[in-house]
């Protein structure tokens, strides 16, 4: 009796941690290239920090009573040395940690940017994932409202570069520590009047982080939050001057904004300016970028008192908008797909493919899928599906004559009567292809 073959279980990815497949990678590359060009134009330098940090970095930096620290962090104990570690839920704290550890501010302020995956343990939904990607900037050592205005305007310039519309700016000021303390006393008094109707989340926050109650999404609490004491009414002269200075700079540069007194952000390190860029095209997850000023953070993490501001934006949400507005660019194919028939032709074709790559052309060489030679027809199908501009064809007869076939697959040269296979001497192949691509591009511009 033959033993029945055991079925091997198919493994799948972790829910909320998504693969970026080849058909989507082009859109990611387009966004990354656009944002990197913008960041270079503003003089920002790239910094790359580890995915895993000591848990204390986030409990001290973000705040122990924030949702991120209380409910959303992927934390674990290192079995080797007992250290408490966390997969980064955001990257501002890590960038600040690195700037302190490596004494990066000894010679003055720094403009830094980062890009990479973040991790939060929450229920996956559209625009909200357990592994998600952010790009962000941190302007360390800049105290004035001009730095706040500059990082906000960077976002507007990025929306313009990407072609996105309908993303609106909301701003607020959280003032200084003593102003928040005075507001906190009055806010708790106000909220205590409604203790019987507050939901569990609001009750939990009432005495630990009452400011976050104003950010509630519960429809039943909207009137309570709307009529609560506003932090902006508690601002002193210094905070008010900073906020008004920001508004003047935004207005002078034609950046429309809305002052939202309930905008508080979910991280404890913010002071003075906070802002969000929001859209109504993504449902409940309408914030695509957010940030503000976090002057106390560098000192909280062991550095010298240093002013700082920055923002982070969710890449997945921006890509959703690009798709929604049909702004995703067409994926570009390679320049050449090399087809061959016969053993001798295969060897010559392989050598030619490498020589073409030496000149800077993008080339796919047809490799056998199953070890057996593929038919000419199937290879040409593969060539067309690859998106290549030209097929270069090596047959035994062509090789014997020192020639090669070239057929246009894309562009003006592939249309109508122009689309005929041409025979070209092998030694002239590179020059022929480059001239053909230039001619095709010029025809396409006409």
Curated annotation (Swiss-Prot):
One of its GO terms (biological process) is histidyl-tRNA aminoacylation. Keywords: Aminoacyl-tRNA synthetase, ATP-binding, Cytoplasm, Ligase, Nucleotide-binding, Protein biosynthesis. It is found in: Cytoplasm. GO terms for molecular function: ATP binding; histidine-tRNA ligase activity. GO terms for cellular component: cytoplasm. Its EC number is 6.1.1.21. InterPro entries: aa-tRNA-synth_II, aa-tRNA-synth_II/BPL/LPL, Anticodon-bd, Anticodon-bd_dom_sf, His-tRNA-ligase, HisRS-like_core, HisRS/HisZ, HisRS_anticodon. It catalyses: tRNA(His) + L-histidine + ATP = L-histidyl-tRNA(His) + AMP + diphosphate + H(+). The keyword Transferase does not apply. It is an enzyme of class 6 (ligase). Pfam families: HGTP_anticodon, tRNA-synt_His. It comes from the Bacteria. The keyword Magnesium does not apply. Gene3D superfamilies: Anticodon-binding domain, Bira Bifunctional Protein, Domain 2. HAMAP family: His_tRNA_synth. Homodimer. Belongs to the class-II aminoacyl-tRNA synthetase family. This is Histidine--tRNA ligase. The lineage of its organism: Bacteria, Pseudomonadati, Pseudomonadota, Betaproteobacteria, Burkholderiales.
